[in-house]
């Protein structure tokens, strides 16, 4: 067989142009597909259906972690330690050189191992998102990964699929295919039987089978892949890293410049002493672990998100999710269960001689019996026996749903040999199909409105005979049969999740294709408000007179949702919100949602989304419902909080080391040992690595990188700690305060013992600072993670042991005993407490909200009192008054000035009372009665397919 396929492998046969029957001959296959064994054999010949992956050298990847601006500074310090530090009759500083190299290797090793683990975990997760396809093997259809496809396979292509390989279409209705990613064509191309479709293009309409003619690198896309620009854009996260790194490097440069100017021309210090002082600033000031800590934190966070049912395709989407303040959510399946049921008693029949059960049967016949969507499953499931949907008939042709026609249809032959068609779909489309008269349209619209007031969707059914007995014929005129009510109950957790979202500062807007009345009713039930508008208002059309003067941007920003929405409206909503500086999330599941998902800051493909929607999204949900998204927001904020905590810590330590040791060196000409700074840096890095798993409180508001806050906090905290160290040095080295007060031995005149004391003081406070930066409230009230706590105490036991017992001549230290160690710990603890107060003061100056953290550990997501609940109640009251025909104030004054809420609260309370009365009335309707009886009998209305009272 291999020799027979050589021409195909070498591309000597033009499978794109030859007749379709010759394609089967050349590929040595049939319309029945390949066998499993033949598929495996061909996989060895043609290779997997994926592009070649670039193999990266592990060694080069490892060395790459030493190639960034922060590492360059450390490498410069290492060279300096042996090339420049050999003056004054002293040998090169080999200890510092080896220590710096060890520090670089340790950081690179941790980065390499963690990124490798994260990469493997991400690869495993992404494998679950790998494109899948329906393939015919061994005479059976099954869903397989697209990578196993080989030339000769028969595949099924339907709406929303990304075409898995180059293929020729077989018999069936034409497809509409979006090839813009490959050819640049903006409009979908129509492809009929026998024509070629390319791998990577998206099916926009239709359903058909095809024979695969090329896979992997042999496809049109595979050949062009090397032309695709693979340049990585510098993301926002990388820009932040660069800005913080540059700030630290500039701070060190300032410190070094001041030291050089003062030490050599003014103080005329020895060359080697000056080099040691410069090494201290270079080694201690550079946050060498920053890229490692932040990358590891993000990788671990991404893994945690996947465990919660949210797979991140783009790592930096985590920081955008943390800052999201508007979520545009689909209704069906996200806010509701997408478990549809039909109340038979409410079915309206418009055709003489037809019973309600027959309307249901027609709807079931116009549904799939396999590979069903929610509506198909509901229709077939309502039959006494699902087999009735195809009982006594022979299926000729099924027209699948598409976003343009918004209907499905089945052509079939009955037991008498007569041809018929039935169709179900959106009422407006079915009415147009039947060329319905004005009086019929009026009656149908009245029924639809009646359903909508109860939150029920409408599905219309029609039928026709086909005298010509061919599937291509138009048939006799269509007859409008009836309308069915569909009830899609809200998820049990949706109302609570929306309340949580509001408390977190995320405004949830419902974006639905359903009618306005249904959207308002669902919004009312979920407590998200009924301030909703039809999609036509987005284009400035059909606005009420009261809101005609409101700009579209304001309308989108203030609305609780929009109904009757098409994909182009979703894109417009996202665009306008982004223009108003909102960080916007958008959920979607269909191929037509892809542009809006791409445009949104965070595109979220919901569970069971099409391949096209998944491809355009940043985050793919593996579980249904809004609660997954809100959990992901909380987790993202926790991840972001860890990263922000570390950056503040890194800036603070740089300022503290640079200016603390610079002042000591210049004022008292005391030269701290570069080796001891290395020990501090190594212990700090070991402790700080655990921050990626720290227990943190997520921010109660949408969070983002605020460099002003990071730098301001870092400078103030670092400056305070530098002064604290300088004061300690002065008190211990130049006065008898500590010996007189605590009866410890005098360190004056003993430089080596002073070195040990100074080392311990710097080590304790440097690491203790992380507890201040990691907490939003008092640092001693927010319990840290166990790993961080253990790492801190282990590092401090080592540091204390070195200070107490160390006697290293090369590092110029000598043990100071437990008495001095206790004094230094006491000094550090006493001067630790003001750090929290300074943190609050900086936040208060910058944002004016930090004092709320001191009082109740909570920051409101808005400056409005009670989370703006009064404003929402006022809008809700406005809608209720309109509903009941009461007089309203001008729309422009719906949101009043401060102080006018009391009156509106009273209006809201009155409206609520009227709403409660309306609900009581609703209980006396048939649907309300059914729900009451079902509840009394202890049945679950969500799981019950249907119930008869």
Curated annotation (Swiss-Prot):
Family matches, as Gene3D superfamilies: 6.10.140.890, Calcium-transporting ATPase, cytoplasmic domain N (3.40.1110.10), Calcium-transporting ATPase, cytoplasmic transduction domain A (2.70.150.10), Calcium-transporting ATPase, transmembrane domain (1.20.1110.10), HAD superfamily/HAD-like (3.40.50.1000)
Resulting phenotype, residue 948 to A: Impaired fusicoccin- (FC) dependent activation by 14-3-3 protein
Primary enzyme class: translocase
GO molecular function per UniProt: ATP binding; ATP hydrolysis activity; magnesium ion binding; P-type proton-exporting transporter activity
Name this polypeptide is given: ATPase 3, plasma membrane-type
Keyword Repressor: no
Active site feature: 330
Taxonomic superkingdom: Eukaryota
PROSITE patterns xref list: ATPASE_E1_E2
Entry keyword set: ATP-binding, Cell membrane, Hydrogen ion transport, Ion transport, Magnesium, Membrane, Metal-binding, Nucleotide-binding, Phosphoprotein, Translocase, Transmembrane, Transmembrane helix, Transport
Plastid is among the record's keywords: no
Cellular component, GO, one term: plastid
Residue positions where Phosphothreonine is found in the record: 882, 948
Subunit: Binds to 14-3-3 proteins. The binding is induced by phosphorylation of Thr-948. Binding to 14-3-3 proteins activates the H(+)-ATPase.
Topology Extracellular: residue spans: 83-94, 266-274, 667-671, 732-752, 807-814
Substrates-to-products reaction catalysed: ATP + H2O + H(+)(in) = ADP + phosphate + 2 H(+)(out)
Topology term for the membrane: Multi-pass membrane protein
GO biological process: proton export across plasma membrane; proton transmembrane transport
Family membership: Belongs to the cation transport ATPase (P-type) (TC 3.A.3) family. Type IIIA subfamily.
Expressing tissues: Found predominantly in phloem cells of leaves, stems, roots and flowers. Expressed in guard cells and barely in mesophyll cells.
TM ranges: 63-82, 95-115, 245-265, 275-292, 645-666, 672-694, 711-731, 753-773, 786-806, 815-835
Protein EC: 7.1.2.1
Entry PTM: Phosphorylation level varies significantly during early response to bacterial elicitor (e.g. fusicoccin FC).
